[in-house]
Amino acid sequence: MTQMNFTDRATRVAIIANGKYQSKRVASKLFAAFKHDPDFYLSKKDPDIVISIGGDGMLLSAFHMYEKQLDKVRFVGVHTGHLGFYTDYRDFEVDTLINNLKNDKGEQISYPILKVTITLEDGRVIRARALNESTIKRIEKTMVADVVINQVVFERFRGDGILVSTPTGSTAYNKSLGGAVLHPTIEALQLTEISSLNNRVYRTLGSSVIIPKKDAIEIVPKRVGVYTISIDNKTVHYKNVTKIEYSIDEKSINFVSTPSHTSFWERVNDAFIGEPEH
């Protein structure tokens, strides 16, 4: 008979917080609550649940920290500022969070993420995942690139760059560019132009395009040079990019399903509209 250690039965929890005072206070309270509770085991290396404390930026960092463990990790966010799109709890709801995790039945809410494949002229292939968005830009000169959707050349783009976002990322940079807001359960990508050049000679669609899950997007630069590619909040520079491919990843991000889950449209209202004046 194999003897079972209490850690085999306990829920393994990682607590990730930003450097703000209030976030540290919440983290300290959670550490103290979980440290001697047999239902939980603190494990930053191999967690079942990752608690992100801060804002949406902190959750993006937590996602990339555990993106190789997405099959077995669920996330939960605690916001120490105003309401965020990835957070279900406020800093004063720590006791509610602990109680809900004690009664957790393993249910989850899943959202699609972005698969990014960058091919360079020397044959190197760089693969990455994005929770919100990815952009490609050519800073010093106008970017010229073919936009290929599902192997069909859709347009030749001229402008500052192109953004591809997930539904959860549609409320971020995409919205500031005039893109549509998509509900996060929709498995689709959104392609949005960044300062496209439109005149009598050069034309682009000039509006966002919603791409279904089964289709892929290719951006094929037509000029040599250094390109700036962002993956969420990280930016890299590559010389002579042959193409960059975007599609819905086979994995998804999973959040702990909680009774206090705030609806997406409430979050949109809170972030961009607010209470009407009377």
Swiss-Prot record:
Its EC number is 2.7.1.23. It catalyses: NAD(+) + ATP = ADP + NADP(+) + H(+). GO terms for biological process: NAD metabolic process; NADP biosynthetic process. One of its GO terms (cellular component) is cytoplasm. Keywords: ATP-binding, Cytoplasm, Kinase, NAD, NADP, Nucleotide-binding, Transferase. This is NAD kinase. GO terms for molecular function: ATP binding; metal ion binding; NAD binding; NAD+ kinase activity. The gene is nadK.
